From Swiss-Prot:
InterPro entries: NLP_P60_dom, Papain-like_cys_pep_sf, PG_Endopeptidase_C40, RipA. GO terms for molecular function: cysteine-type peptidase activity; N-acetylmuramoyl-L-alanine amidase activity. GO terms for cellular component: extracellular region; peptidoglycan-based cell wall. This is Peptidoglycan endopeptidase RipA. Belongs to the peptidase C40 family. It is an enzyme of class 3 (hydrolase).
């Protein structure tokens, strides 16, 4: 759900580089002044120190990527549990239908058997009402033949009905057994998904504790390397007879990133933001809480979808309110003629949340909400939560995971994206998602410590395709 912190709005070939962490190139530009190019030993020393700083920054960036991957694994686990539980509920419904069909088949057999027994007993006790031998006229003979044919046809019909009822019972019992197997498997899958989500939450908490310590260690290494680099630069500058202020920015570990402002001391923006381990004691409670919110969100989406279709004057009695395009189809419930209107409504809905804080796992169809872990105490949105909320206004139901959102809708080459399309970042859209506004701008819930905002589109790390949920 979160974007890769390495990003650049410059050009597609650029790498993601966290703005707050100075790159090797930026340090080199500060160091390689004309006055420093004459002393080869000093230049070699400075080059080595630049490499040390770059390596330290890269290790911090790698750790930041690991944190993002851990958060995404939890978000995906939640979606998997929701899907598995939905499948289990559907399988239980199918099982109930099959069981009712078996009961109906048994009742049909009992009725057919009763009719057959009654007919057989009557035939045995009474025999033909009139025999050929006792017929006294041609009319009586004809009546006897007709009665015999009718009796035979009736007997065959009763037996056929009984056989058909027995065949239907065999089929319904077979279907019921299959439905039971599917229901059992779906229930087992749901349990396995829940166990996986609990394990992901627990493992994430453990890793965050370790990564928090690792950040401090790597930060100390980075600061030490930066201090050595600065000392070497000062020596080189002094050896060239430098006077006045040095021709490069002096680095102070307490002053914030180069060229930036000092921070408030709560966290260092040049370091990866490790979520606090404030997951409640029972991870199952977290899973159930998140899925409860998700179920409510689905109902809210359906209600808003019906309301939107009603406003357009195209609501049908059979409409569920969910307007997503069905699998394999590019056209959803919203006709193309109303597509632009729907897309603008989505954008207005999303833009209304500008300034709302980022909250990992936060956001649903009804609005901002408390998330999980670092987002547990913050009412807000993460990236996919904001997209989910925006499109819910027109009845488009989306999962709360950017990787799953990427697999819905119609994929369009990113070079052809238009206002209202959805932009994804990372492998298979698994790291970040935004809404394209046009003119090179996008709406996003960016990262921990930031707020929903409009920002320039970043091409680095963007998937080859954007996704179009609304056609027009």
């Amino acid at each position: 759900m979160r974007r890769n912190r390495r990003g650049s709005p410059a050009r597609p070939a650029a790498r993601f580089v966290r703005p707050a962490i100075p790159s090797a190139l930026s340090v080199a530009l500060l160091v390689c002044t004309p006055g420093l190019a004459t002393a080869d030993p000093q230049t070699d020393t400075i080059a080595a120190l630049i490499a040390d700083v770059a390596k330290a920054n890269q290790r911090l960036q790698d750790l930041s990527d690991e944190v993002q991957a851990e958060q995404e694994s939890v978000n995906k686990a939640m979606v998997d549990v929701e899907t598995a539980r939905d499948n289990a509920a559907a399988a239980e419904d199918d099982l109930e239908v099959s069981q009712r069909a078996v009961k109906d088949a048994n009742a049909a057999i009992a009725a057919a058997q009763h009719r057959f027994d009654t007919f057989a007993a009557a035939t045995y006790m009474n025999g033909p009402s009139v025999s050929y031998l006792s017929a006294s006229s041609p009319d009586e003979i004809i009546a006897t033949v007709t009665a015999a044919k009718t009796l035979s046809a009736s007997s065959q019909a009763v037996m056929a009905n009984l056989q058909r009822a027995r065949t239907e019972r065999v089929n319904t019992e077979s279907a019921a057994r299959l439905a039971k197997q599917k229901a059992d498997k779906a229930a087992a899958d749901a349990k396995a998904s829940q166990d996986a989500a609990v394990a992901a939450l627990t493992e994430t908490r453990r890793k965050f504790d370790e990564q928090r310590e690792e950040v401090q260690r790597l930060a100390a290494e980075r600061d030490a390397a930066q201090a050595r680099l600065q000392a070497a630069r000062l020596v080189a500058w002094s050896s060239e007879g430098g006077q006045g202020a040095p021709p490069f920015r002096m680095w102070d570990p307490g002053s914030g990133p180069a060229g930036g402002r000092a921070w408030d001391g709560l966290w260092d923006p040049t370091l990866p933001m490790i979520p606090s381990a404030n997951i409640p004691g029972d991870p199952i409670a977290v899973v159930n809480q998140v899925l409860g919110i998700s179920a409510t969100s689905a109902q809210v989406t359906a209600n808003m979808g019906r309301k939107f279709l009603e406003q357009l004057g195209i609501l049908q009695p059979t409409d569920t309110g969910i307007t997503n395009a069905p699998a394999g189809s590019a056209q959803g419930r919203i006709p193309r003629v109303y597509g632009r209107q729907a897309s603008e409504y989505v954008i207005r809905r999303g833009m209304s949340q500008i300034g709302v804080p980022y909250s990992w796992g936060g956001g649903n169809a009804a609005g901002p909400s408390k998330g999980i872990d670092s987002g547990a105490g913050t009412v807000g949105f993460d990236c996919s939560g904001l997209v989910l909320y925006s499109f819910a206004g027109v009845g488009i139901k989306l999962p709360h995971y950017s990787g799953s959102q990427y697999n819905l809708g119609r994929k369009i080459p990113s070079s052809q994206m238009r206002r209202g399309d959805v932009i994804f970042y990372g492998p298979n859209g698994s790291q970040h998602v935004t809404i394209y506004l046009g003119n090179g701008q996008m709406l996003e819930a960016p990262d921990v410590g930031l707020k929903v905002r409009v920002a320039p589109v970043r091409t680095a790390g963007m998937t080859p395709y954007v996704v179009r949920y609304i056609e027009y």
